[in-house]
């Protein structure tokens, strides 16, 4: 059974509980409710193209929007899909290969994502390194 079908049962159960709790505040469900209502923007951490494609499939099934994929070293492989879905990539300029899932990057990753679908792509350069962030203008 595909994983999204397994989650479907959980989603139905959560939806049922939300209906029962109308008028009550269920703090543990506030974030999920915010995502489903569009109030919370989803910033998803993924390295690999297959992970991003799976998350896009889940977002369509459960009707929520992914705003950006962070790190996304394989975003160039699905750049057109990201552009079609209006999903940005918050990408490293030149930091990859430090672990298995961050191995398959190309130096043109940012450019490919940004120029997908004749410039309709969305790519921003970021760093989560305290030294690297100070020198992004050199990358």
Predicted features along the sequence, with ranges:
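Active-site environment of divalent metal-dependent phosphoester hydrolases
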Residues: 49-53, 72-79, 131-133
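Short hydrophobic/aromatic-enriched beta-strand-loop microsegments
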Residues: 64-71, 88-93
């Amino acid at each position: 059974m595909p994983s999204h079908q397994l989650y479907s049962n959980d989603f139905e159960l959560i939806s049922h509980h939300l209906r029962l709790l109308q008028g009550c505040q269920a703090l543990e469900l506030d974030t999920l409710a915010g995502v489903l209502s569009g109030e919370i923007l989803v910033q998803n951490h993924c390295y690999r193209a297959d992970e991003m494609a799976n998350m896009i499939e889940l977002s369509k099934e459960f009707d929520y929007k992914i705003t950006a994929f962070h790190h996304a070293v394989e975003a160039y492989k699905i750049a057109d899909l990201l552009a079609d879905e209006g999903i940005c990539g918050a990408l490293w300029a030149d930091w990859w290969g430090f672990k298995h899932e961050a191995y398959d990057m190309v130096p043109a990753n940012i450019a490919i994502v940004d120029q997908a679908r004749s410039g309709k792509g969305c790519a921003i350069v970021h760093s989560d390194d305290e030294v690297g962030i100070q020198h992004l203008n050199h990358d």
